[in-house]
Amino acid sequence: MIKQWAFTWLPRPATAISASRGRRRSHRFVRQWGLHDLNKRLLAERGNRVIGGPFAGLVLTDLSQCEHIGPYLLGTYEMELHAIWAEVLKRPFKQIVDVGASFGYYAVGLARRFPAVPVIAFDTDWWARRAVRQMAAANRTPNVSVRGFCDPAWMASHLKPNALIVVDCEGHEGRLLCERPLPAFSTATLVIELHEEFVPGVTARIRAAFERTHSFAEINSRDTTAVKLQDSGLTFDELRRVSQEVRGPQKWFVLTPMETPAER
């Protein structure tokens, strides 16, 4: 109840505190569970370029390696969305907005795939903003700009028609996307990780806000398929552990606009 109140009435500090706490807890677990050492062995074998998935070739920098980097490196991260990304990456966009960018896997990965499109990466955690800048420099993506808190006022002032919006902001998604019905939303493609556990009712709120302008795909998380690598010094069990995400159940909405700017 307190967390829901904070996200509703104090979204800027609430999201910053939640993001920072979550990142510190995640980094601590990576070491406690032995995943940091497994990741280091995998990096020593395969290097620091992503070898699979929609963002193959992406360079993973030093700060990113504080995370459980195995799923990113192997291309198994959020593999439930791979088919979605295969379709999304075929479309033209005028702008890409990533809210809750973490270390920049999606923001910089998308910037490489759309080098002429401006990418704005938001994260309220100072560590994440630093990591995104490092990733953007290493991957030579000057089209990435990094910001802190994203709110409805920024969307109202800066969102362009035919944008791609990627949202993973720990319950802030309802306020960000539903508080102001913006014309630019009607032509945006959105990939939204839902956080019903933080803000009950946010799923229904987003559906109600966009059901007249978008088609919906609802994606549920599933177990990651372990990667098989040839000539690896890691055992099958180690490869399973290093390729799987440590997470609970997740759900995403993928919203596709029913019209394009040319049809308006």
Where are these regions (language model features)?
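Conserved Class I S-adenosyl-L-methionine
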Residues: R207-N220
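Proline-centered flexible-loop/turn and helix-kink motifs
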Residues: P115, S186, R212-S215
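S-adenosyl-L-methionine
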Residues: M1-F122, W127-M135, N139, N143, ...
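Residue-level signature of transmembrane alpha-helix interfaces in integral membrane proteins
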Residues: N139, A184-S186, A209
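Short, aromatic/basic amphipathic alpha-helical patches
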Residues: Q134-M135, A204-F210
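Active-site segment flanking the S-adenosylmethionine/decSAM binding pocket
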Residues: Q95, A101-F103, R129, V144-R205
